[in-house]
From Swiss-Prot:
InterPro entries, sorted: EF-Tu_GTP-bd, EF-Tu_GTPase, EFTu-like_2, EFTU_2, G_TR_CS, P-loop_NTPase, Small_GTP-bd, T_Tr_GTP-bd_dom
Location of the region described as G1 in the Swiss-Prot/TrEMBL record: 19-26
GO terms under cellular component: cytosol
Organism: Burkholderia cepacia
Family: Belongs to the TRAFAC class translation factor GTPase superfamily. Classic translation factor GTPase family. EF-Tu/EF-1A subfamily.
High-level lineage: Bacteria, Pseudomonadati, Pseudomonadota, Betaproteobacteria, Burkholderiales
Superkingdom in the source lineage: Bacteria
PROSITE patterns: G_TR_1, G_TR_2
Compartmental location: Cytoplasm
Name this polypeptide is given: Elongation factor Tu
Length: 396
């Protein structure tokens, strides 16, 4: 089959499958690509193509992730599926594949299992905003009451972790039947219902360029006669010449004005998300700005030192620590472009954290960082990455 040309006519959404091992995440991923390809074009992926997920590196951590894409009537989706539980933990914490919504796959025969619960908790902690449920293997459950019971259990579990359990779409089906071309209620029909749920329940995400302006400071120069130039890559939003901006983090927040935007040595009237630019600041001295701060739209982001986080600690094989760490461990936290020292407080029931674990922690930094929930960071010791984390909740 000839490869179709990729047309950016439909809005793009990132999703992924989550759930307990052997509940059918990869089979469902294969079924979605197969059924939607028949209907809307694209490229079907077989189970073994998805299961042999290539290794990637994100923040120095090796993760196996399979990426597939498919289209529905209204949208283009990029979908991630991970072979092993550890890959999910790493993927969600590093944000290697950020999800606008997740498809929770739960076997109707088993009901919610430990990883079902852990993936819902992780989704909550790392800020996955929406979950849709695919109740899989319904062909192997004859008892309608049992199905209802499993559905209730899943809804209760979602509500427990602050997802709207009662309003969450739950699609009942069999990924295996759909993959085999079964056109019945549990086969292709269920996949089409799932596609419809994706289209209607997950809102189209805000594009980076529509957000409030934010640029992490990478470098600062002084240009005689012109003032101070700050360089970096615009993370989101747009900055226009003449606009007021704030310098946030590390030191007290100050306001300044953008008097010029340069890209590839050319002057522009604005810089936008994705651009590598130099921004000229009026009346700002070179020593007023440093790497690790951000330039931002006034009032859009604030500096903090105290927060809770979900972290993954690298195993020894991944180049992480060889020994556990304990309460009050003081590593460096690498946010965007710089390291800040901080101390870690472990949960009451945790005496120590072993390499390869994931854990919820509380952190106190020695200097404030421009921060919002969902911000990713690395944990380092002497320049070497020993963990990855995401801000779950700001405390101060």
């Amino acid at each position: 089959m000839a490869k179709g040309k990729f047309e950016r006519t439909k809005p793009h959404v990132n999703v992924g499958t989550i759930g307990h091992v052997d509940h059918g995440k990869t089979t469902l991923t294969a079924a979605i690509t197969t059924v939607l390809t028949k209907k809307f074009g694209g490229e079907a992926k077989a189970y073994d193509q998805i299961d042999a997920a290539p290794e990637e590196k994100a923040r120095g951590i090796t993760i196996n992730t399979a990426h597939v894409e498919y289209e529905t009537a209204n949208r283009h989706y990029a979908h991630v599926d991970c072979p092993g539980h550890a890959d999910y933990v790493k993927n969600m914490i590093t944000g290697a594949a950020q999800m606008d919504g997740a498809i929770l796959v739960c076997s109707a025969a088993d009901g919610p299992m430990p990883q079902t619960r852990e993936h819902i908790l992780l989704a909550r902690q790392v800020g996955v905003p929406y979950i849709i449920v695919f109740l899989n293997k319904c062909d192997s459950v004859d008892d309608a009451e049992l199905l209802e019971l499993v559905e209730m259990e899943v809804r209760e579990l979602l509500s427990k972790y602050d997802f709207p359990g009662d309003d969450t779409p739950i699609v009942k089906g069999s990924a295996k039947l759909a993959l085999e071309g079964d056109t019945g209620e549990l086969g292709e029909v269920a996949i089409m219902s799932l596609a419809d749920a994706l289209d209607t329940y997950i809102p189209t995400p805000e594009r980076a360029v529509d957000g409030a302006f934010l640029m992490p400071v990478e470098d600062v120069f002084s240009i005689s006669g012109r003032g101070t130039v700050v360089t970096g890559r615009v993370e989101r939003g747009i900055v226009k010449v003449g606009e007021e901006i704030e310098i946030v983090g590390i030191k007290p927040t100050v306001k300044t004005t953008c008097t010029g935007v340069e890209m590839f040595r050319k002057l522009l009237d604005q810089g936008q998300a994705g651009d590598n630019v130099g921004i000229l600041l009026r009346g700002t001295k070179r020593e007023d700005v440093e790497r690790g701060q951000v330039l931002a739209k006034p009032g859009s982001i604030t500096p903090h030192t105290h927060f809770t986080a979900e972290v993954y600690v690298l195993s020894k094989d991944e180049g992480g620590r060889h020994t556990p760490f304990f309460n009050n461990y003081r590593p460096q936290f690498y946010f965007r472009t710089t390291d800040v020292t901080g101390s870690i407080e472990l949960p009451k029931d945790k005496e120590m954290v072993m390499p390869g674990d994931n854990v919820s922690i509380t952190v106190k930094l020695i200097a404030p960082i421009a921060m919002e929930e969902g911000l990713r960071f690395a944990i380092r010791e002497g320049g070497r990455t020993v963990g990855a984390g995401v801000v779950a909740k700001i405390l101060d």
